[in-house]
UniProtKB/Swiss-Prot annotation:
Assigned protein family: Belongs to the pneumoviruses glycoprotein G family.
Stretches for region Binding to host heparan sulfate: 187-198
Full protein name: Major surface glycoprotein G
Biased composition (Basic residues): 190-207
TM stretches of this protein: 43-63
Length: 298
């Protein structure tokens, strides 16, 4: 019923708030018009009343909102009180403590006093594990380990046979003559041939290729010695034939035989090298005395 009343009041407050806002807007519009003095006074009075009513409505709305919040806190308090009243009894794990069923706060206080008397100077926290039964729930309180550095637990020691098996893992059966432990060990070896060990081949390093080329040996070529061919002696050409002919003509102007010989000599010299006989004949003629020309007698 209280919820319905609160909802109704909230709705009425909202409606009044809206109507008052509309009235204020209308009164402000009418006041701007040029009306008579009496009408303006009445409008101003109405505006003052509406503004005060708006303030009152806002206060009521805030109060109702605060009233809505308070029941929730009361419900929470009631729930907590019910939980405290209906808490079940707790039983401890150790019956030697002699703790009777009671509230959990009393149990924890008694346990802390006992632990403080047995282990002074060590801080310990309680780890409670709840075990649910059909009707009651029991908590098992166990003192936690001290906060000092915990040593790692060593693994449990293995039996002697396994220890020997680990040590003598590669024992061939040929060695065992009358030793029973040796025979037991050599039987446990899986299908592995005795005496052979797996050898890992060393990995070959990749050979680095050198980009530089090997210098080739320079072969010195023997320079050919220029063989000087014997220069052939130039053939004596009788190029100066005009000089000889002029000399001969001056000496043999009157002898027709000499002129014929000179003509034959001139023809042979133009064709090629003269024979030694011709050369000798040409050289002999200047040495001969020139005969005087035959002048006709009168």
């Amino acid at each position: 019923m209280s919820k319905n009343k609160d909802q109704r009041t909230a709705k009425t407050l909202e409606r009044t708030w809206d109507t008052l806002n509309h009235l204020l807007f209308i009164s402000s519009c009418l006041y701007k018009l040029n009306l008579k003095s009496v009408a303006q006074i009445t409008l101003s009075i109405l505006a003052m009343i509406i503004s005060t009513s708006l303030i009152i409505a806002a206060i009521i709305f805030i109060a109702s909102a605060n009233h809505k919040v308070t029941p929730t806190t009361a419900i929470i308090q009631d729930a907590t009180s019910q939980i405290k009243n209906t808490t079940p009894t707790y039983l401890t794990q150790n019956p030697q403590l002699g703790i009777s069923p009671s509230n959990p706060s009393e149990i924890t206080s008694q346990i802390t006093t006992i632990l403080a008397s047995t282990t002074p100077g060590v801080k310990s926290t309680l780890q409670s594990t709840t075990v649910k039964t059909k009707n009651t729930t029991t908590t098992q309180t166990q003192p936690s380990k001290p906060t000092t550095k915990q040593r790692q637990n060593k693994p449990p020691s293995k039996p002697n046979n396994d220890f020997h098996f680990e040590v003598f893992n590669f024992v061939p059966c040929s060695i065992c003559s009358n030793n029973p432990t040796c025979w037991a060990i050599c039987k446990r070896i899986p299908n592995k041939k005795p005496g052979k060990k797996t050898t890992t081949k060393p990995t070959k390093k990749p050979t680095l290729k050198t980009t530089k080329k090997d210098p080739k040996p320079q072969t010195t070529k023997s320079k050919e010695v220029p063989t000087t061919k014997p220069t052939e002696e130039p053939t004596i050409n009788t190029t100066k034939t005009n000089i000889i002919t002029t000399l001969l003509t001056s000496n043999t102007t009157g002898n027709p035989e000499l002129t014929s010989q000179m003509e034959t000599f001139h023809s042979t010299s133009s064709e090629g090298n003269p024979s030694p006989s011709q050369v000798s004949t040409t050289s002999e003629y200047p040495s001969q005395p020139s005969s005087p020309p035959n002048t006709p007698r009168q």
